[in-house]
Amino acid sequence: MSKSVSRLKSMKKVADKIDHSSKLRTDIPAGMAAAGPPLGPMLGQRNINIAAFCKDFNERTANIKPGIPLPTRVKVNPDRSYQLVIHQPPSSFFLKQAAGVTRGAMEPIREICGKVTLKHIYEIAKIKSQDPPLEWKSLKDICTMLIATARTCGIEVVKELNAKEYEEFLQHRKSVVEEQKKLLQEKREAKMLRTA
């Protein structure tokens, strides 16, 4: 009995030395880190110097087009320093850019908001393979993941794409999106009238 108690005490001593502070996981627009909400309070809770962090982040993302959302991971050290890891933009961002749309479909399985070719998928996979979580995955696995993401966004993956037909499709899609926005606005107004 006493041996097991002494083992537990020794394990507790080792466990006390491990730092289990939470990582900050958030998306920050490239070159637009500011001390205001929502980023400032998140950094303040973890005792990070907000001004130094914003300056560091904006310097690291100076070569990227401003406003692109970048998934960021921040690990805080006990001495208030931090380790900053900036990933590539999300897959959905790349897919929407390749498809030429600003937003995904409201009903992804039933509705198609855009189209991309397999070549687009391959090029995006090459970019995403530089991300730390995907470094050890094969390009085939990343392409499969991107095709699944495209499906959830309402983007169809095709072998070839005709430019004229796709332009007509996008024009038609633009009118559909306008109708959807009007419908949503009407629902919001009706809800406001009910609650007022």
Predicted regions and their residues:
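Long, charge-patterned amphipathic alpha-helical coiled-coil/hairpin "stalk" segments used as oligomerization
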Residues: M42-D131, E135, C143-T144
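Positively charged, low-complexity, intrinsically disordered RNA-binding extensions
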Residues: I112-A196
